[in-house]
From Swiss-Prot:
Bilayer topology term: Single-pass membrane protein
Family of this protein: Belongs to the ATPase B chain family.
The organism of origin for this protein: Klebsiella pneumoniae subsp. pneumoniae (strain ATCC 700721 / MGH 78578)
CDD domains xrefs: ATP-synt_Fo_b
Record-given protein name: ATP synthase subunit b
């Protein structure tokens, strides 16, 4: 064998041993460190994605709850509005009934007063008619006619 080839082989073996002993471990450590950083970054991104999904789900739930609460509040407000309107209508109806009753009472009182006034006037007319009958002293048939007319007027 040739001494040059043997020298090259020994130099190559020493070079490989040197690389394996001093160069390869720092390279592997750097590669492993980089792999760990990438792995940690991916895990962190995955956690962030899960957190984002969870936050979105929570936000959606809270939005649904808020909408439901708003709907309940709106329904309660509508019920209260209807109740207030019904109360106002009932109150207005009572007031109308009261006013109508007062007006009817006033009308009845006025009607009664007018009848009393009319009776007084009829009595005055009856007295005046009786005076005329007495003054004229007409026959019995004429007196009957006058009395019948007075009765008809009453």
């Amino acid at each position: 064998m040739n001494a040059t080839i043997l020298g090259q082989a020994i130099a190559f073996v020493i070079f490989v041993w040197f690389c394996m002993k001093y160069v390869w471990p720092p390279l592997m450590a750097a590669i492993e460190k980089r792999q760990k950083e990438i792995s940690d970054g991916l895990a962190s991104a995955e956690r962030a994605k899960k957190d984002l999904d969870l936050a979105q789900a929570n936000a959606t739930d809270q939005l649904k709850k808020a909408k439901a609460e708003a709907q309940v509040i709106i329904e309660q407000a509508n019920k209260r509005r209807s109740q207030i309107l019904d109360e106002a209508k009932a109150e207005a109806e009572q007031e109308r009934t009261k006013i109508v009753a007062q007006a009817q009472a006033e009308i009845d009182a006025e009607r009664k007063r007018a009848r009393e006034e009319l009776r007084k006037q009829v009595a005055i007319l009856a007295v005046a008619g009786a005076e005329k009958i007495i003054e004229r002293s007409v026959d019995e048939a004429a007196n009957s006619d006058i009395v019948d007319k007075l009765v008809a007027e009453l």
